Amino acid sequence: MQQYLDLARYVLEHGKYRPNRTDTAGIGVFGYQMHFDISKHFPLLTTKKVHWKSIVHELLWFIKGDTNIKYLVDNKVNIWNEWPYESFKKSPHFNGESQKEFIERIRQDAKFAQQFGNLGPVYGKQWRDFNGVDQLKKVIAQIKVNPFSRRLIVSSWNPNEVDQMLLPPCHSLYQFYVQDGQLSCQLYQRSGDIFLGIPFNIASYSLLVYLVAKETNLKPGSFVHTIGDAHIYENHLEQIKLQLTRQPKPLPKVVLKSDKSIFDYQFDDIELVDYDHHPTIKGEVAV
């Protein structure tokens, strides 16, 4: 995807040093926007392998309103493990367990998972219960009856609850837009980790468009990605530079294999077709 490579190159060339809350500094810019046509192909990065299983399970987890990592852990999705583990280490119940041991106990012990696996009122909670409002269900209903509304918005940023979240929402607000039978979406992301996070976010919200479009008898249109603080961590610089040496491959397609409600979708109902990619590039997450 050339749009992603252009973003990475722009931040490498124009980014300024940015200290932050983590122990890993980086370079960043403020305010960047990408446009993706998702009507025929699916924007899953090809200059490295992106873990499709994690993207799908995380989105289904959001849609179900879940905020506990047990569902993810049970499905071998490890993208949220660090934050509950860091919280557990500060509790009086911590006895020197490694993160691997902590996650294994989450998998095996439902009571332990209920106590220590929760991230607080993060995305799923806000999408499905923002101070009592089921935003996702409400916006889908509005698309069906008033598709030209300018209020087709879901916010994950709840000032009343943000301090209770182990990680405040990076992708903070999204808006749907209907034109000529197509559904489009714009995401505002307050903070974007270009190497690890942004490829996931592009794919996740594009998949959300596919699911909501099917639910509302529309076709996928476009995805617009607006990033506030777009940054590359210093321990990802070489990985980004490696990606810039790779030629993007043709984009895959996504097939939705079920007519069930978006709220009942399962992993096997979603099929990724013809995903041709360059090899995996590893990088550590900044917690």
UniProtKB/Swiss-Prot annotation:
A cellular component term, taken from the record's GO annotations: cytosol
Gene Ontology molecular-function annotations: thymidylate synthase activity
Residues bound to dUMP: 21, 150-151, 190-193, 201, 231-233
InterPro entries documented for this protein: Thymidate_synth/dCMP_Mease, Thymidate_synth/dCMP_Mease_dom, Thymidate_synth/dCMP_Mease_sf, Thymidylate_synthase, Thymidylate_synthase_AS
Pathway noted in the entry: Pyrimidine metabolism; dTTP biosynthesis
Enzyme class: transferase
Function: Catalyzes the reductive methylation of 2'-deoxyuridine-5'-monophosphate (dUMP) to 2'-deoxythymidine-5'-monophosphate (dTMP) while utilizing 5,10-methylenetetrahydrofolate (mTHF) as the methyl donor and reductant in the reaction, yielding dihydrofolate (DHF) as a by-product. This enzymatic reaction provides an intracellular de novo source of dTMP, an essential precursor for DNA biosynthesis.
Complex formation: Homodimer.
Protein name: Thymidylate synthase
Organism expressing this protein natively: Mycoplasma pneumoniae (strain ATCC 29342 / M129 / Subtype 1) (Mycoplasmoides pneumoniae)
